[in-house]
C-alpha cells in the first residue's frame, strides 16, 4: 500500500506541474489552474503519508481520494460543482473512474 501511494502521489505532483507547463492543445486533461493546484496539494499530502503515515492514514487517503475521483467523474457528467472550475474533458472522466475505483479497492483490500 505504501508503494502504491508513493507512486500515485508522484504522478499527482507530475500531473499538477505538467498542467501548468503544457499548452492546452497538447494536454490530455483540462489544465485548469484550480485542477493543477488540486493535484499538487493532494500529491504532496499523499507523498507525506507514504513516507511518514501509518497504515490507517494511507488507507484513509486512498479510499478518500478514490471517492473524490469517482465523484469528479459523476460531477462532470451531471454538471455538478466543481465542473466549471476544473473544466474536465472526456479523458478526465475515464481517468477518474479507473483511478477512483482502483484506489478505493486498494484502500479496502490493502
Enumerate the predicted regions with their spans.
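Membrane-interface extramembranous regions
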Residues: 1-110
